[in-house]
Amino acid sequence: MSLIMSSVVATALVSLILAFIAFWLPSLKPDNEKLSPYECGFDPLGSARLPFSMRFFLIAILFLLFDLEIALLLPLPWGNQLFSPFSTLLWTTTILVLLTLGLIYEWFQGGLEWAE
């Protein structure tokens, strides 16, 4: 048997043995203490299902999108060392223009206003 196949079989065997032990070893019998919610040592005061602000959700999505675009700019110092630094400058300018246009669009749509 090859080394890779032996490793796969050994890993699968160890995983199955550990899963079998984890399934049969603890005899969990649910009681009131185990089924009660735990919140910093206190009983919960209210429902955990609070209304979620859609404005906060939109701000979080905008942050993720703009953060991703900024992450595209991180390898620029290495891109300037390529054979064609002009293409790096062109792509950098394109990304920055798209980022700026997206920010202006969200600004005019009122997506950056936290309170109305």
Swiss-Prot record:
One of its GO terms (molecular function) is NADH dehydrogenase (ubiquinone) activity. It is found in: Mitochondrion membrane. GO terms for cellular component: mitochondrial membrane; NADH dehydrogenase complex. It catalyses: a ubiquinone + NADH + 5 H(+)(in) = a ubiquinol + NAD(+) + 4 H(+)(out). The chain crosses the membrane at residues 8-28, 56-76, 88-108. Its EC number is 7.1.1.2. Keywords: Electron transport, Membrane, Mitochondrion, NAD, Respiratory chain, Translocase, Transmembrane, Transmembrane helix, Transport, Ubiquinone. Pfam families: Oxidored_q4. It is a multi-pass membrane protein. Disulfide bonds: none annotated. InterPro entries: NADH_UbQ/plastoQ_OxRdtase_su3 (IPR000440), NDAH_ubi_oxred_su3_sf (IPR038430). Belongs to the complex I subunit 3 family. Core subunit of the mitochondrial membrane respiratory chain NADH dehydrogenase (Complex I) that is believed to belong to the minimal assembly required for catalysis. Complex I functions in the transfer of electrons from NADH to the respiratory chain. The immediate electron acceptor for the enzyme is believed to be ubiquinone. This is NADH-ubiquinone oxidoreductase chain 3. It comes from Scyliorhinus canicula.
